[in-house]
Amino acid sequence: RSAASLSFDNTEVELLPWTGNLMTLAGAVITAPMAGAMDAALEISVGYANDREQFGKKIGKFQAVQQELAVFALEAAAANSASIAVFAALERGEYDFEAAASKLRCNMAASEATRISHQVHGAIGFTQDYILQSFTRQIWGWRSRFGSEAFWADQLGDITTSQNGNDFWSFMVGRDQG
């Protein structure tokens, strides 16, 4: 089912010169919907925890649930920060390091975010009729696209170890955050 229809008839497109790695670019770009879906799943999970009652009180009042949601919020914030950083790097034109770091961080966050969201919801989170699964299934799909955690960790390692030992610190702290 389509949500919208776009037409680009008679639209002029300017071709820009680009010599980058398509896998790196794709890995960078996919972090935005990953981060957005994690935000949505977090909002749904917090809302559910604040509505669902068990043992006479809202499950969001239980310390264990609060702790898990705090970890989820941290992971979602990390994914958002990583995605923002890689898009700033894309604007600068030097994004290999940020792409590897961002996709790796978003993949790591995806594991925790989906685990926690489904634990908070219990079985209802997996049902086709409940909205949570539409976000978590997308997160898992995007996580597996354009390279695994091991792939991006290797990329990040290759980039950092290719720096001259004397210039490594400058390379790390001199990254412009846009």
Where are these regions (language model features)?
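Alpha-helical interface subdomain recognition
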Residues: 22-178
